[in-house]
UniProtKB/Swiss-Prot annotation:
It is a single-pass membrane protein. The modification Phosphothreonine is found at T113, T117. GO terms for cellular component: membrane. The chain crosses the membrane at residues 32-52. Its main location: membrane. This is Transmembrane protein C16orf54 homolog. Keywords: Membrane, Phosphoprotein, Transmembrane, Transmembrane helix. Coiled coil: none annotated. Disulfide bonds: none annotated. Residues 122-140 have a biased composition (Low complexity).
Length: 225
């Protein structure tokens, strides 16, 4: 009986062999995948942005408000604790010279009361008689010379102060000038009690208009002293 030749079980040329993977990709449609991927991407972006915002607020250094910041404390010579000003030089000068009440009472005391004190009345010289007063009223009196006003206030010298024995001075006597100083030379500055800072007794007579004109002329808005 003749034997019929069997075909080889190997791959046959020209005939594509269908595989299981190709059948799976062909069967599953790709239409629903696109909206699902877009939804997942949107959710991921939302979580990333939220995490970045929370981290920025958590780790950001708070910026202090310049109007409410604490003053700077500085130790000066002599063991004094000073507070550095936070405003500009123009604001401080306008506040200083524009205030209605004096900020410093470093000036001469006001005129005494007409009656005076009991000690003043007791030590007062006897009053002059009436004829002498009538004669003095007939004599023309020259007005006293008024010294020219200075920009700075200074205490009156011994020659300029009127010597009145009927008044009792309550201000302490000033120290006498040293022997080594010449007459007319400026007095050396005196340190304040318990400090090395000088005690400046001169206070300028400057109005608020002059201060504003000075800053307008200088053209400076904020300069630190």
């Amino acid at each position: 009986m003749p034997v019929t030749p069997q075909q080889p079980s190997g791959h046959t040329e020209g005939l594509p062999e269908p595989t299981a993977e190709a059948a799976v990709w062909v069967v599953i449609p790709c239409g629903p995948c696109i909206p699902i991927m877009l939804g997942l991407a949107s959710l991921t972006a939302f979580f990333i942005i939220t995490t970045a915002v929370l981290a920025e607020r958590l780790f950001r250094r708070p910026q202090p408000d310049p109007s409410q910041r604490a003053p700077t404390l500085v130790w000066r010579p002599g063991g004094e604790l000073w507070i550095e000003p936070t405003s500009s030089a123009r604001e401080r000068s306008e506040d200083w010279y524009g205030s209605s009440m004096p900020l410093l009472m470093d000036r001469a005391p006001g005129p005494p009361t007409p009656g005076g004190t009991l000690e003043g009345r007791a030590t007062a010289p006897p009053a002059t008689s009436a004829p002498y007063s009538s004669l003095s009223s007939l004599v023309p009196q020259t007005p006293p010379e008024v010294p020219a006003q200075s920009t700075f206030w200074r205490p009156q010298t011994q020659e300029e102060r009127p010597h009145d024995t009927s008044l009792v001075s309550w201000v302490g006597s000033e120290p006498m000038p040293e022997a080594g100083l010449q007459v007319g030379s400026p007095r050396p500055w005196r340190p304040r009690q318990g400090s090395l800072e000088p005690d400046w007794g001169l206070q300028p007579r400057v109005t608020l208009e002059q201060i504003s004109a000075f800053w307008k002329r200088e053209g400076r808005t904020s300069v630190g002293f």
